[in-house]
């Protein structure tokens, strides 16, 4: 019993010495008032800047319709705005490198979601429930030696 008393006294002394201060992370906002975030998917990395505007989206100095030919890609990229009901309220400027079209689409989607989360903290719960803030960590499995592909093996003959 006396050991417990000594330990609790030590803990109480430590707590009374230094007040507990929670550090809030600095939001990535540049001088012009844009929210910055990076999104990743497969080998693609997207840098996204979000600012209050009229809903214009620019990807690598092209409009979103010019960069992504398929309408389904555009709809999936606009998903965070649909969930948070902020369509035509933010302008998006992003640069994407690496990967293919599908990976770039996922990277932009992830970056926009993270930037929206920084712009308004009440969007966090909505975006988290939609699964847009979690990074999709699936990447291509490497090819193993002695095999044709990552999982495919050469034909086996018993005799």
UniProtKB/Swiss-Prot annotation:
Keywords: Ribonucleoprotein, Ribosomal protein. Pfam families: Ribosomal_S9. It comes from the Bacteria. One of its GO terms (molecular function) is structural constituent of ribosome. Gene3D superfamilies: 3.30.230.10. Disulfide bonds: none annotated. One of its GO terms (cellular component) is cytosolic small ribosomal subunit. GO terms for biological process: translation. The keyword Signal does not apply. Belongs to the universal ribosomal protein uS9 family. This is Small ribosomal subunit protein uS9.
